Amino acid sequence: ADGGAGWANPDNLELDDKGNLWMVTDIASEVLNQPVIDRDKVSNSSLRGIYSNNSAWFIPTSGPYSGQSFPFAIGPAETELCGLQFSKDQRTLFLTPQHPGIFNGRRKDMAFEERKFALKTTDGKEFFQVRKVPIGSNWPSKEPNQPPRSSIVGVRRKNNKPIV
């Protein structure tokens, strides 16, 4: 998106009780975190490699920010976030990080690779970012060498008020 604030591959959608739209992305794990050294020499599809992980977004449908996208959550490595669902009292948003490690399996000995990305700031200036990209996943334990597992996560406010 212009200005560098965007997403690709929208997937599951949910509406909260105020009518706001919630959305998760589903970019294949083998496409994520693929080096982009020169943005002008790759296809638009290959630019999806600049995305690090799948994510959840909040999109207000009324008010001064109507139609703008706001990042809400970033999924663990090599997962897709899905199953967006609010509790009846709107105090919990459930997400399911699904099939962690689908591309590289279990992360062994905290393995990672350094990769370079040609990015742009929100005002269009180019810069390079170097990432340490995990190879595989240990979600949800986050303990070295543990097998990855799908899970359900509930997100709540510390003050126990509705999410929105």
Model regions: which residues?
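Sequence/structural signature of beta-propeller domains
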Residues: 1-164
